[in-house]
Amino acid sequence: MNKKQKEEFFQRLESGEGCNFRKDEKNETIWRCYGGNDKRFSRLILKRMKVSKIEANKFLKKCDDNGWHCDCEILFNAEEPIMGEK
């Protein structure tokens, strides 16, 4: 994935298409994530972006290898290191 695709992926994962980060009535940040090893939003977004299956699996394996096992862990921990790659 190129840098532009990675940026788009992280934006979409944070949006209503993915984890849906938002403020609740107490102004606290809430989101949805199924935890564990569930990356359903990441997989769906990569598919919708038409990222090849090989490239998507490579990206998701890299996430697993770094301990980013679910969608919210990818957002909380992966964006900076992945976007910083050359």
Identify what each model region corresponds to.
Residues M1, E7-F9, V51, K58-C63:
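Short, flexible coil/linker segments at or flanking structured domains
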Residues K53-K86:
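Short, compact, well-ordered microdomains
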Residues K3-Y34:
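N-terminal acidic leader/helix
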Residues G18-N20, N37-D38, H69, K86:
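Compositionally biased, intrinsically disordered low-complexity regions
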Residues R22, G36, E73-L75:
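General secretory precursor processing signal
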Residues D38-F59:
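Short, charged low-complexity linear segments at domain edges
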Residues R12-C19, R48-S52, N66:
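Surface-exposed polar/charged interaction patches
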Residues E25, K39, F76-A78:
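Secreted/processed peptides and extracellular or luminal domains of membrane proteins
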